[in-house]
Amino acid sequence: MTVLNEQNTMQMLQYIRVFLSKQQDSMLKLLETMVQIESGNTDKAGCDTMCSLVEGELRALQVETRRVPMSEKGDFLHGVWGDCYPGAPILFSGHMDTVFPKGTLRNIPFRIHDGKAFGPGCLDMKAGLVVAIFALRALQESGFC
């Protein structure tokens, strides 16, 4: 466990900045993979596929996951990591469904244009899921816990 003080907090933040700057390609690849999964809010199979992907990403980071099966909507996913640091926990919260119906990818495929990513669910909230996963990865790499 790292005891944080002003000096090592600044060192850790610098390490995290450098680490994340080197992860851009990996982050975009994961975002593209997520966007390619059509997970409209009425598409249980698509939402469950997204849940499996996120669960796999979290488990690869040694996050203890618990999946809550749902009968009509996509499954819920709960993950816990980092109980080795005293103090307030860090909460990542999000959703894996989109408002886009199945088939939208044919007309609105994933693309990068002028440094911005586009595609169904890109903004709400698949990019947020990627950010959360890579934030956790950065914390682990920095020795936070």
Question: How would you describe each model-predicted region?
Answer:
Residues 8-120, 141-145:
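Acidic/His- and Gly-rich active-site-bordering loop/insert found
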Residues 126-145:
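Acidic/histidine-rich catalytic neighborhood of metal-dependent amide-processing enzymes
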